[in-house]
Amino acid sequence: GHFENLGIYEMIRRRCHLIVASDAGCDPDCAFEDLGNAVRKVWINLGVQIDFQRIDIKKRDATSPGLYCAIGTIKYPEPGAKDGYLLYLKPGFPSDGSLPADVNAYGLANPAFPHETTADQFFSESQMESYRSLGSHIIDVVFGSATASRPSGPTAAISPFWAHIEEYVSPKMTADRK
């Protein structure tokens, strides 16, 4: 098997301060096994803690769609070290009609979508396009209008992206606390 499927371990070992990890593993129950494995190994081997306030990514048959991402705070242990952030993305299939029509149709016809086994190495054109389109939809939802005006240059700020992610996550978290 693999040591850690999301690439989080190596990025934390390199002391990255903003990590974006996309979990495309077959996880229909949203057990977050790959994320749990990464968080555990990072803590045990590197002494770095990753804290999530809450993960509100839901399995396909949930009554509410949940979110496509969660934000974790990376607590680097060195004196004076700044915290880092982990943006954890995971595909879902909301039943609220928000998906593009072709993706929704594919998902309704294929109940395992978007958590089909990776043992299937021969995706059809419609299957491949549905995954690609879902990924594009997720990025548009999570990053919103910030993707339309991407900053350029090697020193461009990421604050517009991060601000939209926090805006996307915050209302859901506030509503759930009530």
Language-model segments: what does each one mean?
Residues 1-178:
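Catalytic domains of lipid- and phosphate-ester/thioester hydrolases
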